[in-house]
Amino acid sequence: MPSRRNVLKQLAAIGALAGLGNLPGKAFAADGANPEESALASANTPFHMPEESTFQTRVWVAFAASAAIWGRDYKEVQATIGRLVQAMVPYTQVNVLCREAEQARARQLCGEQNTRFIVAELDDIWLRDTGGVFVQNGEGELGLVDFNFNGWGDKQEHEQDAGVAELVSKQADARYLQSKLTGEGGGIEVDGNGTAILTESCWLNSNRNPGMSKAQLEAELKANLGLRKIIWLPGIKGKDITDAHVDFYARFVRPGVVVVNLDNDPESHDYEVTRQHMAILKQATDADGNKLELHVLPPPLDGRDNRFSRSRDFAAGYINYLPINGAVIAPEFGDKAADSYCHELLARLYPGRDIVQINIDPVAAGGGGIHCITLHQPA
């Protein structure tokens, strides 16, 4: 599988964008902040991150592709986001963040059925990473953890995107909770019952959490997300802008059941990495001591040949799908056998849900997928 988003590393700062104006500063970053709001480091925090396929209130996307980042492809990327929104709205409400100057185009491409458009200042489309992580507590209160997005270790301009999580929390009427850690939502996979799968290459990285030990990082993540156990995969540093987010390697379907990416292209750097991950997951147990049931979902080997798929960053991974109410939204890459297997496997793993596959080649050329550009809000 080609690497992800290398092409974005060299981007210069983007000019000011039309929108809401400057977002307020981080609410609880300073020492001595309100302990009720910022004490995410406490092991007794009532908040936990639900498993993704549980019932959702809505899905968020960022209609933010620009020529500054995407060059000549930005209109195709915008159209792909519109196609994704239209695939989701029969099943769930979609909130679309967009720049003020692009509202008309966003409405044209996304449609206005079951959608809400929110003006925001944005750098890029990767809302899974910029929008924070929704959590809940035992009283049904919704929270949102801000993991202090820093452009995947200052690899990309992120002045506007650094404020998106706080914006989302306000728009969702969720309690804003700021972590001590720096990371991204695409780097977190949970079963909703206390177990998470993470990659060391992403979280134990000096470009995000310098000087922090594994034990310190685990303690903070467990407090932030209500975890009892973390299964660590090695990942791989420096091959893509994210340093190997877990949402391209392993996904929980429900507690005890995991979909695993196994790259069968011997020329891919992920060929060995995914086999290391498989070996670890075969031996792993969840927070309750149960072995994991693993299902392999390999990338396509014979997909469409176009200018997008020829990008060295083309992310041809089915595993980056999104479960929503009544459906699973997944990519198709023009490899008939692989596309069909993806559909068949997801139909077995998510019974009773429609499996909707769409062409995401323009987004995949930027190194991401459907999961990367969406943010689900639990009910």
Can you describe what each PLM-predicted range is?
Residues G32-A379:
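The feature marks the mature, well-folded catalytic cores of soluble enzymes
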Residues M1-S3:
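Secretory targeting signals
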Residues N6-F28:
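N-terminal export signals
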